[in-house]
C-alpha cells in the first residue's frame, strides 16, 4: 500500500513544462486580415466601419439617432485611476487619462467613418455609453465612468461635452471594475 502511494505521489509530481504555451502567439493583423477571419451566415456581410487610428481599445459602442457611432475607449482598463489623479472630488475628469467617448461619423457616405469627435475626455474606464440628450442640448449621452453614471452634454454645439452631471453614484469599484453599468 505504501509503495503504491509513493509511486502515485512520484507520478503526480512529475515536472511540468515551465511555460506551457496556452495561446498561440501571432503578430498584429490588419483590419482587412481580421475581416477575412470572420465566419458569418450566408445572408450576412461584415463591413469595416472604423479602425485605428480613429479608435483605440474600444470597450463599448452604440449607434445614435443621427446615424453616428458612439464609442467608449479605455487605456486605463483594467486598473481604474486612483483618486489622487481625479481633478475634483466627483471624479469628473482624470489627470493624464486617455479614456474617452468618441463620436464617429461617415460624412461622405462611403460606409466608413471619416470623422471623429472626442466628445468627453479624461474619463475613467467608461464601459458603457448610451447616446441621448435633453431637448435643450445639442448632443449628449449617458455613460458609466468610474465612480458614477454621468450625463454628458454639448450645450454650445461645438461637439464637446461641456456639461458633466452625476445621475447616480458614487459607486464602489475598488474590488472590480466590471459591470457597474448593468
Question: Language-model features: where?
Answer:
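Bacterial N-terminal signal peptides
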Residues: 2-15
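Beta-propeller domains with acidic blade repeats across secreted/periplasmic ectodomains
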Residues: 15-182
Amino acid at each position: 500500500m505504501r509503495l503504491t502511494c509513493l509511486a502515485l505521489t512520484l507520478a503526480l509530481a512529475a515536472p511540468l513544462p515551465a511555460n506551457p504555451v496556452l495561446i498561440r502567439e501571432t503578430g498584429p493583423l490588419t483590419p482587412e486580415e481580421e475581416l477575412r477571419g470572420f465566419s458569418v451566415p450566408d445572408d450576412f456581410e461584415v463591413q469595416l466601419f472604423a479602425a485605428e487610428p480613429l479608435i483605440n481599445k474600444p470597450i463599448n459602442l452604440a449607434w445614435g439617432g443621427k446615424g453616428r457611432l458612439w464609442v467608449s475607449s479605455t487605456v486605463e482598463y483594467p486598473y481604474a485611476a486612483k483618486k489622487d489623479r481625479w481633478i475634483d472630488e466627483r471624479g469628473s475628469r482624470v489627470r493624464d487619462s486617455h479614456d474617452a467617448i468618441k463620436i464617429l461619423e461617415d460624412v461622405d457616405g462611403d460606409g466608413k467613418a471619416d470623422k471623429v469627435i472626442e466628445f468627453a475626455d479624461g474619463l475613467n474606464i467608461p464601459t458603457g455609453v448610451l447616446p441621448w440628450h435633453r431637448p435643450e442640448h445639442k448632443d449628449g449621452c449617458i455613460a458609466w465612468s468610474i465612480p458614477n453614471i454621468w450625463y454628458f452634454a454639448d450645450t454650445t454645439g461645438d461637439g464637446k461635452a461641456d456639461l458633466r452631471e452625476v445621475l447616480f453614484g458614487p459607486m464602489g469599484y475598488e474590488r472590480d471594475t466590471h459591470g457597474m453599468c448593468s
